[in-house]
Amino acid sequence: MARWIPTKRQKYGVAIYNYNASQDVELSLQIGDTVHILEMYEGWYRGYTLQNKSKKGIFPETYIHLKEATVEDLGQHETVIPGELPLVQELTSTLREWAVIWRKLYVNNKLTLFRQLQQMTYSLIEWRSQILSGTLPKDELAELKKKVTAKIDHGNRMLGLDLVVRDDNGNILDPDETSTIALFKAHEVASKRIEEKIQEEKSILQNLDLRGQSIFSTIHTYGLYVNFKNFVCNIGEDAELFMALYDPDQSTFISENYLIRWGSNGMPKEIEKLNNLQAVFTDLSSMDLIRPRVSLVCQIVRVGHMELKEGKKHTCGLRRPFGVAVMDITDIIHGKVDDEEKQHFIPFQQIAMETYIRQRQLIMSPLITSHVIGENEPLTSVLNKVIAAKEVNHKGQGLWVSLKLLPGDLTQVQKNFSHLVDRSTAIARKMGFPEIILPGDVRNDIYVTLIHGEFDKGKKKTPKNVEVTMSVHDEEGKLLEKAIHPGAGYEGISEYKSVVYYQVKQPCWYETVKVSIAIEEVTRCHIRFTFRHRSSQETRDKSERAFGVAFVKLMNPDGTTLQDGRHDLVVYKGDNKKMEDAKFYLTLPGTKMEMEEKELQASKNLVTFTPSKDSTKDSFQIATLICSTKLTQNVDLLGLLNWRSNSQNIKHNLKKLMEVDGGEIVKFLQDTLDALFNIMMEMSDSETYDFLVFDALVFIISLIGDIKFQHFNPVLETYIYKHFSATLAYVKLSKVLNFYVANADDSSKTELLFAALKALKYLFRFIIQSRVLYLRFYGQSKDGDEFNNSIRQLFLAFNMLMDRPLEEAVKIKGAALKYLPSIINDVKLVFDPVELSVLFCKFIQSIPDNQLVRQKLNCMTKIVESTLFRQSECREVLLPLLTDQLSGQLDDNSNKPDHEASSQLLSNILEVLDRKDVGATAVHIQLIMERLLRRINRTVIGMNRQSPHIGSFVACMIALLQQMDDSHYSHYISTFKTRQDIIDFLMETFIMFKDLIGKNVYAKDWMVMNMTQNRVFLRAINQFAEVLTRFFMDQASFELQLWNNYFHLAVAFLTHESLQLETFSQAKRNKIVKKYGDMRKEIGFRIRDMWYNLGPHKIKFIPSMVGPILEVTLTPEVELRKATIPIFFDMMQCEFNFSGNGNFHMFENELITKLDQEVEGGRGDEQYKVLLEKLLLEHCRKHKYLSSSGEVFALLVSSLLENLLDYRTIIMQDESKENRMSCTVNVLNFYKEKKREDIYIRYLYKLRDLHRDCENYTEAAYTLLLHAELLQWSDKPCVPHLLQKDSYYVYTQQELKEKLYQEIISYFDKGKMWEKAIKLSKELAETYESKVFDYEGLGNLLKKRASFYENIIKAMRPQPEYFAVGYYGQGFPSFLRNKIFIYRGKEYERREDFSLRLLTQFPNAEKMTSTTPPGEDIKSSPKQYMQCFTVKPVMSLPPSYKDKPVPEQILNYYRANEVQQFRYSRPFRKGEKDPDNEFATMWIERTTYTTAYTFPGILKWFEVKQISTEEISPLENAIETMELTNERISNCVQQHAWDRSLSVHPLSMLLSGIVDPAVMGGFSNYEKAFFTEKYLQEHPEDQEKVELLKRLIALQMPLLTEGIRIHGEKLTEQLKPLHERLSSCFRELKEKVEKHYGVITLPPNLTERKQSRTGSIVLPYIMSSTLRRLSITSVTSSVVSTSSNSSDNAPSRPGSDGSILEPLLERRASSGARVEDLSLREENSENRISKFKRKDWSLSKSQVIAEKAPEPDLMSPTRKAQRPKSLQLMDNRLSPFHGSSPPQSTPLSPPPLTPKATRTLSSPSLQTDGIAATPVPPPPPPKSKPYEGSQRNSTELAPPLPVRREAKAPPPPPPKARKSGIPTSEPGSQ
């Protein structure tokens, strides 16, 4: 037999399809699940998913993609570590975590966050794929890593997940390998970085002006990206477009041009540039970004003929001005607009012509045509006019571009925006240097601008069309190829031809080009300008020769470069070839300035070649701007560099160096420094230059400290270590420095000294490097100890300086403290580190106390940051000083201590001591512990939790505690001199720890920091616990408060939110457990041990420690619970033994109180309840004396927990207020039994609030009444627990009770329970009248009571219906299961609405269609079955109302209120069926339900506590029916007699239903069934009942007579036929009845109308028993023959409704002997009339007045038009899910009433003591819980486990079309 083989290589994989397990042995997989594979066998793997390691199973091999992994501890306990990059693993786990949250966001409809997360997730997935591809270069991978980590961190913050701390390379920090301080700083940095990123994104989203924002403060260089889309303009010739940035306020161009050559065909000249015309204008500084206005301008130059329409014979290739296009881009530059996709239209303005027609005659010849005049205006002039104009008439012509501002220099832009900027992108540089000059940026650009000229027209009648040709030549006259660049985007050209203006004497060009030549060529080169007239005729143009030449040299004779600015050039004319001979004309002056100088010298050259008069008339002006990193225009700098050739000017040049522009100096940094040190060394004889060179060096170092030149720091460093070679410079430099410091009191030297101190770091680098070079060449022996002495001397000078009074040289002192530590790392290379440490100690000590405190602390911080402090022997010297200074600071109570600087210093010390490479640290830790631990603690205790420094101090404390080992702890305790000192320290520490645990110093998302704190605290707590046990355990030394604080601290730690693993995601939980374990268990076990160690002291902690221990036991960790729950038994036992009372009441009360608080706060679960009960019972049963009382208590607590858990579940999860009420009452019940009034009252008010929210004012009143009943009408003070938080401010019980009564009366009034309100107001009135004598209050109360009386009679008060609801099946919770409840419906609520409301609470419940009690099969079913039907309340009238004519409005209250019994009747058949008269065998089964409490009460439902059933015989049923009918007729007649305004329709329907045999039939059934000899022979005992029935039939006649009479009086035309029919039928009926059953007359007093005192009619309700008693029978007896002689062919009906059973019998003729069930579906319109007959068959015969609910349908307007046969008067009791219309009642039309017959019940009577006499009611059924529902087939047994078949093949993977799809058919899952 084959077997499973352990895998060797296949250890780790990912599911690539979903797999649904079909057997228990299989493991379900979802796509993406990672699996650890343990074994394999024939195409199957066995293992588990890494998300749930506890469940192992098998799964098909083909569903898994294997991945590389490292296996640790191979074998039974092996673990797999994926072999992917750590970043990929982080990405994977992040995506898994986000995916879960992403789904939740969608479910919770948080769509904005959902979409944000979706985009971030897509980005991460894409980047993960790129990383996994392995194709990225190293630098791109590093860049992508930054993007990935930034995105993860941002997403985590957005989702409220934990902050991930990383090192500089983006790798996650391991807290075990990182110091606490470094960890804290990393959290701060990460938090700040994410916050800045979020703010940056917000700013972009909100389109904020980003100037001044952090993004601009960190970036100094920008670029503007321009993407040229199209140029729409009808030129007809080629064109050149010059785009540049322009400042309209200063009328200057900011950048060089970007050139686009546009063809005459409307496309780029180079077709490859189509859709690829883009440029970046670089080097923009932050100053450029805040210019008030910036424009993007485009100048268009036409290249072709002089005139547009000229033909072939005309000259072509001329550059002619055409127009401009301008766009204001200020918003884009300022960052307000940022959309690289948006295309901007820049309107084109052609040069205007009309404006020049006027001027033509004045300045031009009349021969000129007008169309070219406008073209002579300079483009820059047009440009400014367009900018000034509000709008341009562009006629649809213009440019289309898109723009984007890019932060960073060119290199950064190419890296960060590679999708925009590539190799083909043109780079247009700024005409000037960027804000920050980079050392590697070699640039040699000379910008030349042709400004204007003036040329004599000579022999021509019109001015010339001058074209300037510009070229670059060397001194030999040789042309430099491609040296001129008209614009970026194209290579250089050799000659540049200017724009030609037509016949203009003084043309203005303003054309700028860039001359770019090699630096070494600059000294030899010059620029030549040739002037030529261009003719529009091609033949003439060819013959035109250059008429003039001008030139300018790029270097001045003194070696400086041509100065920036304007230059007036001399235009030389002549026809000889000397004009082209550079050797010749270079001897001439190039500029007017040179000429003036030469004229003074009267040179010989001027004699041989003197310009003619014409040449002096011509002028030409240019402007130059040089942007060169290698050329200087500064004479002084050049003089310094060439100092040897002009040594007499050294002093002058050194002084002038300070005035040279920094940009010039950094260009020649190395040369300048070489010159300085050469001067110092070569001129060593004289000290004259030493100070000047020193000052110059300081100036240069300071210059490089400027932000503009900060990137030259590496250049300076490189110079010092690679090029600097002055071996003796240290002597001179240190001498000068010493002199300056020693003479600090010389005010003339103050600024020089201050500058020197700022440059101290680099000064000393020069000094030390010089000394190193010296030692390398000469060794130590030459100068003895001279150098060391100079260092000592320097420190001595500093010490003297620091010791001077503060007001003197405070600036210098501050600078010394700030900059002196910067020399440490260099000096220690050539100076003894220990001595250096001593020197620094003396330096610090020389500063007077309380002076420059912050500067001093910062100085010490820098000392600690230096490498000096990392040497153990140096620390021996420095640390005592540092701890002294710190302890002085932290102890300083008089002045405000500098917490920021102190924490910085302390954290740096501790961070160094935590390093592995700094030697032994134990002694140093001990020193810090002894001197600073207590001070740190006290600082933390005294510091505000909102202080910005609290986090740093706590980190220092954690770091120190972490670095202390066990011996440190022991030693520290031994340093305390007295026992009290130890107590004080422990007290402080415990209180501080507890405070820090309770109020988190660090943000919740600083998970690593918080867990590090927890781990350190746990160790410290355990260490201090040992101290407690050692010093404070025995009877003499026991410290109660200390132990108490320990326990409370330990519990606070254990219950801290950061340790509650259950609340975290699985991923986070695994992370924490793997790194830190479950710390709760460790501290929990320690708490247990410490408790048991207390011995006889335990009693001192009862009951105070019950709550904390309860918190521990409630922690959802099974082992911890098992370990700590027995402490409860120990407490019980302890109190039982030591209290002297032989009980544990203190413990019991405290546990109940705390349990209530904790469970309500969300703690505890079902498992806890079971475990608590089990463990307590186990321990109690073993105890000799606690076995019985302990067992009772254990069960009691278990019961309480069950109620509280139910309550919490409903409150937290169920939206149904009813279910919340139910659980609240359950808890109330418990606390009432336990006499815990404090908690009881608290829950009363919770219930009150729930009722108030639901507008259940009656129930709210009854709830408050329970509180009022606990109070007395006395002046006893109110104990606190009797008052609630929202209660009134009162002092005595009487005051509180009065306030409560007023509120209760108000609620009763709102709930229309005026009878109850009257009762309470009487009690309150008595108090007002005879106790407190508040007559004013009494008057108001009586007025209110009067209104209640009035409301009872006049106000409409609908009666609620009552419903019985049975919950059957095991699917319901235990407190509902197989129980019946009676519900009080809301106003106008029908049964259909009610049942629907219930079913929404229990969606899984199945409606039962039967009203029969279900069988055992239903009750034991795992499903939920619900039975719902209407029941009728049994009225219980007060004795004072019996046998009295009580008004209907008063009785109505008792019909539906103050009831506790309810009835439901169901017909069934008994005996043999009589085909002629089924009525004789139809019986009624009447069920009476008695509830636990009277309605209304504190709930709208109560459980049925007793059910009794009786059977009503057909004869008794007939009697009841007749009595009810007679009551209805009587009262309907009375109402119509007394109130003529009532509608006659209900009376018509009632009468026709009784007297018209065609509608209802007659009483033939009664006659057939009961009025026969046979019946009386068989039932002689019924003789009296038969007589009674006959009398009731006879009694109906006088009532009908009165009814017919009133009907006739209120007759309308429409009703006449009906009335005639009624009268006819009634005459026949009356004649027959009087003949057989006698004549009965009613006394007149029954129909008298009584006036109330106010004149209103009081309508008495007359019962059928009263009618019988008071009626007079004139025919004493009637004999009814057995032959049913009253049938008269048509059956006659004896009652208002006839028999209830008649319709049933007609429909059920074929049914069996007993009707077992009346289905809900059988009720239809035919049996609705039986409602009249089903109204509560069950009234006691002893009652004179019985309860009957009004029948609303008789008066409802919706029923008026219906035929009598379909009267909607049926009782709901036979139709559980079809209710009647709600009852209605108005003062003007009281509803017709049908009292119940008097009949004795067979059921036992129930007590109805009212709410005060009964316990608090149990809960109503709450909504079912999800887990309590079950499927229909859940009763089936689970199928047996599959047997492994050897040959079973694994299922094939699903088709690969969609990996995410779930396979529809899988062999493996069948």
UniProtKB/Swiss-Prot annotation:
The modification N6-acetyllysine is found at K818. GO terms for biological process: bone remodeling; cell migration; myoblast fusion; negative regulation of vascular associated smooth muscle contraction; podosome assembly; positive regulation of epithelial cell migration; positive regulation of substrate adhesion-dependent cell spreading; positive regulation of vascular associated smooth muscle cell migration. Keywords: Acetylation, Cell junction, Cell membrane, Cell projection, Cytoplasm, Guanine-nucleotide releasing factor, Membrane, Phosphoprotein, SH3 domain. Residues 8-69 form the SH3 domain. Residues 1784-1794, 1815-1824 have a biased composition (Pro residues). GO terms for cellular component: anchoring junction; cell projection; cytoplasm; cytosol; plasma membrane; podosome. The modification Phosphoserine is found at S365, S1756, S1766, S1785, S1789, S1834, S1869. Residues 1231-1642 form the DOCKER domain. InterPro entries: ARM-type_fold, C2_DOCK-type_domain, C2_domain_sf, DHR2_DOCK5, DOCK, DOCK1_5_SH3, DOCK_C_lobe_A, DOCK_C_lobe_C. Residues 1797-1808 have a biased composition (Polar residues). SUPFAM superfamilies: ARM repeat, SH3-domain. Residues 1679-1702, 1772-1870 are annotated as: Disordered. The modification Phosphothreonine is found at T1794, T1814. One of its GO terms (molecular function) is small GTPase binding. Residues 443-627 form the C2 DOCK-type domain. The DOCKER domain may mediate some GEF activity. Interacts with CRK and CRKL. Interacts (via N-terminus) with tensin TNS3 (via N-terminus); the interaction increases DOCK5 guanine nucleotide exchange activity towards Rac. Interacts with ELMO1. PANTHER family: DEDICATOR OF CYTOKINESIS, DEDICATOR OF CYTOKINESIS PROTEIN 5. Belongs to the DOCK family. Guanine nucleotide exchange factor (GEF) for Rho and Rac. GEF proteins activate small GTPases by exchanging bound GDP for free GTP. Along with DOCK1, mediates CRK/CRKL regulation of epithelial and endothelial cell spreading and migration on type IV collagen. This is Dedicator of cytokinesis protein 5. It comes from Homo sapiens. The lineage of its organism: Eukaryota, Metazoa, Chordata, Craniata, Vertebrata.
